[in-house]
Amino acid sequence: MQPRFLLHGALLALGIQLCLSIGKITGHISSIEATAADIHDAPSTTTKYVQRTVYAGREKGKIGGPADSWPQRKLDDFLQNHGVKSLDVPPIETPSQFWRKPLQYVSKVTDKCKSFYEKEKNHASHNAQKLDVWIFNSWTNSELSRWLIKNKYEVPEPGTREQLLETVFQASMGDAISTNDELESWSNNLLLSMLDQKNITVPIGASHDDLIVLARRYYDIEERKSQDKVTNITDSQPAPYMKEIIHLWSDGRLIDFLRERNIPISVLSPRETLLKEAYANRFTPRVMIASNVLDGWSSEDLLDWIWKYNKRGSIFSHVAYNSRHELIHAAKLFYMDVASEWSSSDMASLNDSLYSHPSVSKQSTWTEEELKEELESFGELVPVPFSSTKAFERLLPHLYYYLRGPAFLNRIHYWQTFLGNSLKRAFVLSQ
C-alpha cells in the first residue's frame, strides 16, 4: 500500500508543476500576440526585431529595479563611482574658473551697458529736437518770456507765440550744443536765425554747408573765450605761498632764508621769484653750521658770547654795530676767524656754548628797538601801544619759521602727501 501511495503523490506533484508551466507559457504567448498585433505592419518580422519590439513594449512598471527608490544624491554618487557622467550634476569648477566667473559676469554686464548707452545716446540725439519742441509747445507765452529773461536772452517783439517758440528753441539748442556735429541736423532757417542773432555776417547765396562752417567757427570762438575766462579765474586765485607767513617778509629776509639752505639766488631776483623759491624750499633744512644758531640770539646774548670767548687780542676786541644784523654778521666773522686758529679742544668748548644756548633768546634780553626792527624786517605789525610781551609773541612764529621751517604738524602732512603721491606714481608706472 505504501509504494502505491508514493507513486500517486509523485504523479500529482508532476501534474501541478505541468499546469503552472502551461499557465506561464500561455501568459507569455498572449503578451507576444498582443505586441505582435501592434506591429503587424512592421517591415521586418525577424526574431531579433520582434524580440526588441516586445522588450520595448513591456510596461515600465513591471520592469522595476532597486535603483527606482534611490534618492538623487545616491544615484549621482553611484554614477560617479562607476565613471558615468550625470547630466544633473554640474561640472566641478577649477580655482581659475571660480575666480574668472565674476569677471566674465562683470564683462558681460559692462558690454550690455555700453551697447545700451550707445543705443540710447543715438536715440536721444536723434529725437532731441522733437523733445524740445514738444516741451516748449506745452509752455504758455508768459512762461516762454520768463525763461528768456531768466537766461538773459532778448524777448522778441511783438512777441508772437511762433517767435517766442523759435527764440526759446534756438537759445536752448545753443546752450545744449556740446559738439559741432549737432549743427548738421539744423535747418537753414534755424542756422540763419542763430547767425543773425549773434551778429555774424552771412554771405549771399550761402549753402547749408557754408552755414554750418560759420556756426562751427562761432562756437569755437565762444569755447576759447570760456576757456580764457576759466584761466583768468584760476590765475586770480591766491598763490600757495600766501598761506605761509613768508609773504610778509622783506626781500633781504627771503634771500637769507634761501642762502642758509644752499639755494642759489640772485639779489636782483624779483620778489615773486623769491617768494616761490622760499615756498618751494620751506621744508629744506638749514646748513648745519655752528654759527647759524646765532640768528635767533638777541644783541645782549651776542655781546656776552663774544666778550666771553674773545682771546688773544682778536680784531673783535671793540665791536661797533648799528643794528642787530650787523652784530650777527660780526659774530659769525669772529667764529670763522677763531676756527682757523684755535685748537680742537677750544673749538669744542666754543661749539658747546653755541649749541647749549636756546635757539631764540629770552624775551628779557630783547630791547624795544630790536623787537621793532625784527618785526619790521619780517613785515609784522608793531603793537600799538607798544608792548614787549605782545611784540615778542608776534615775533616768535617768524623766528621759528626762519630757523626751522614750518611747524611739525605741517611737516607730517607734507611728507604724508608726498609719500602718497610717490606711491601712486610708482603704481601707475608699474602697470
Swiss-Prot record:
User: Entry's InterPro entries?
Assistant: Ish1/Msc1-like
Q: Where in the cell is it found?
A: Nucleus inner membrane
**Alphabetical GO biological process terms:** cell division; mitotic nuclear bridge organization; regulation of mitotic nuclear envelope disassembly
Keywords in alphabetical order? Cell cycle, Cell division, Membrane, Mitosis, Nucleus, Signal
Cited Pfam families: Ish1
What GO cellular component is one of the record's annotations?
A: nuclear inner membrane
Decide whether keyword Signal is in the record.
yes
**Chief location bin:** nucleus
Signal peptide stretch: 1-21
Judging by the UniProt lineage, the source's domain of life is Eukaryota
Q: Which purpose does this protein serve, as stated in its record?
A: Inner nuclear envelope protein involved in nuclear fission, which is achieved via local disassembly of nuclear pores within the narrow bridge that links segregating daughter nuclei. Les1 restricts the process of local nuclear envelope breakdown to the bridge midzone to prevent the leakage of material from daughter nuclei during mitosis.
Write the protein's name.
Answer: Nuclear bridge Ish domain protein les1
